[in-house]
Amino acid sequence: MQEVIQVNVLGKDDDEEIKIYELESLINTAGGKSVAFVSQVVTKVNPRYYIGKGKLEEIRDLAEKLEVKTIIFDVELSASQLYNLEEELKLKVVDWTSLILDIFAQRAHTKESRLKIKLAQLKYQLPRINKWFAYLSRQAGGIGTRGPGETMLETDRRAIERDIRSLEKALKDIEKTKRINRKSRDNIYNISLVGYTNAGKSTILNGMMKLFGSEKYVYSDDLLFATLDTSTRRLDFSNTKVTLTDTVGFIDNLSKELNDSFLTTLEEIKFSDMLLVVIDASNNIDGQIATIDKSLDEIDIGDKEIIYVFNKMDKVEDPTAASLYKREYERIFISAREDEDLRSLKDEIVKVIKEDYKQVKMHIPFANGAVLDYFMTNYDILKTDYDNEGTIIELEVNKGDYNKYESYII
């Protein structure tokens, strides 16, 4: 396990303890171990090093004492800042964006997510090439290497730009396929689990699968970004069939490259009928909701049903504090490891879904037996009758099926 020193850059209103914990958790998720931390309140960014020169001395002395070779910052550094810091410290420097991209690369399991991570890495790398090649040229001796270095730089830049175009085209092709797949499940109620990292989304999905489904579990661990790829499972809630999608968690301070890496998740959210916003009730409720609300506003989720799920209530010292949190949406308080709580969540979901159902009477000709089979399989039929031409059924249908089969309604 690689030992590192973490550097936390604080704004005047930041909570130092939370910032330290978040970066330490990310380092742990990446497979490293934070052996010390250095913090500095920065009101004006040093364009050369981001932090002050005095802090650099402190970091250098600490690294020498602990024999640490890697420093990790919790901010995104410019190409010149990365270069200057490594030159000054003679140590490897990793910034916030590079750290998270590394975690994403470790945890990407589908073709789409791997392509997205590669694209984000290339877009992150492109503006930094100049400084990297300058550094390599100096290591090689400087004089006599400038021409070849510049040629190599231009060749590498063109190669990266070519790879970016190729990846963007491949991702567009994947999106076309996904659009077709979404259409194939238009008549199933689609629900997405969204929330902060490590809030318990995968635990909820796994619990729901155990109680109401039969497919494999989703990887779940006490790590930030344990889920990178979106994972969709089908569930049967008492003849109400739904898909439930687990997504990578939200987090603050994401660069454009990292936001692009979230597109898989964000696109699934857009095509959902309902969002389950999962909140870790034991940790900074206001901060989580602020991050989630901001992200949902940015992706324009439209008019969707939303249930706020306050999870980990078993870890809350004062349960009344969470229950007093007022939202304009439905809310429920659970511990995702308790089956009874998950059944209560299922009941709440079904209640909200049913509010969108309409009771109808349909006449289905005998020649359209497949349509009748569909409703018999997927709905509770309230009443059945027959005439000389077909079957008459009464039932409650969802909005999608109401629109699709409106011609059968009498």
Locations of regions flagged by a protein language model:
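N-terminal accessory targeting/assembly segments
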Residues: 1-102, 409
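Flexible beta-alpha connector loops of hexameric P-loop NTPases
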Residues: 11-14, 47-48, 107, 152, ...
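Conserved C-terminal guanine-recognition region of P-loop GTPase G domains, centered on the G4
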Residues: 22-26, 60-61, 77, 82-87, ...
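Alpha-helical coiled-coil heptad-repeat register
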Residues: 116, 123-126, 130-133, 154, ...
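Conserved G1/Walker A P-loop phosphate-binding module
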Residues: 139-256, 269
